[in-house]
Amino acid sequence: MKPIVVFAMFLVATGCMTPSQPGTTGTLTPTIQAEVGREFEIAVGQEAKLQGSNVVIRFRGVTNDSRCPSDVQCVWAGNAVAGFDLSGAGQSEALINTTLDPKSVSYGGYTIALVGLKPTPKSGSAIPALEYIATLRVN
């Protein structure tokens, strides 16, 4: 009888360790290293440290996404707004657009530009907040 109780406790314990968000592993790559002049991708909640400086960019998430779905023909491309926390030269928050201005921000002597945002919307389905990946370039 005792082995059954131990096995049941094992199942309960491992069941409590599953990720709360479907499709995620519960872990993100640690802070990535970004190079000036090169594009890099950053996931929601992830940080990128700019090589050769103290500047750190953290992708907070997308606050608004009205981009045209890939399976629809639109008269306007739409716009998405991505939020970032910036640190290393004082604390700052930045909202950067995909289509409208500002498409970049100045911080710590650098220009941080949003050059892409994935995934592309599809009609009839919302993008889960944690699935966004921003492509940035710092000059």
Go through each PLM region and give its residues:
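Bacterial signal peptide processing site
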Residues: 17-20
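N-terminal secretory signal peptides
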Residues: 28-73
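Mature extracytoplasmic domains of secretory-pathway proteins
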Residues: 56-98
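Short, exposed beta-strand-loop hairpins at the edges of beta-sheets
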Residues: 117-130, 135-138
